[in-house]
Amino acid sequence: MLDDCLVSVEWFAVFPTDPQWVPSQDREDAARAVFEVLMGADIEVKVNRPGRVVLEDAGECIETIGCPACGTLVGENPKAMDWWVAQLDRVWTDSGGFWPLDVTMPCCGVQTSLDDLVYDAPQGFASWSVAARNPVYAMGEEMLALVGAALGHPVRWAHRHT
């Protein structure tokens, strides 16, 4: 634990594209096994089943948040994050987490989901994830597809520095 205080820690998380989707135990085990092989030997891997929708965030790596319809920036870190934070507060419940994710964009009035906003760096919402601490390898699209195939559902990712 002392190393957590002395150096930055990276987490690379993979999670289903549907925020409420949770795999069967067999699919979870298969996806974890594939993920562990792809991430490298001796890497700490953890599975998260929080029982509600959580934000798999990019941490301090998040730079901008954009509208998926018109491209307008609605958030820029560290300034101008008020609208996005207010939306997170609005949808949060203790029982469901961040659900429902419906939002009306302030720029163009389009109805969309907080999960569909354009995040730079990538992040999203999930009820299940698998994550590697300080991974040895970067994961490309082909590797993500392998994890998704083992999971039985398409996946996305978030890379967080803490």
Predicted regions and their residues:
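Long, contiguous alpha-helical scaffold regions
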Residues: 122-162
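Short cysteine-rich clusters marking metal-coordination/redox-active sites
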Residues: 67-70, 105-108
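Short linker/helix segments within small regulatory modules
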Residues: 85-103, 120-121
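Aromatic/basic-lined ligand-recognition segments
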Residues: 103-104, 113
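Short, non-ligating residues that shape and space the ligands of small metal-coordination modules
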Residues: 75-77, 114-118
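Charged linear interaction tracts used for macromolecular binding and regulation
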Residues: 68-85, 93-96
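Short, flexible, solvent-exposed loop/turn segments with mixed acidic/basic and small polar residues
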Residues: 1-6, 116-124
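N-terminal alpha-helical interaction blocks
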Residues: 1-65
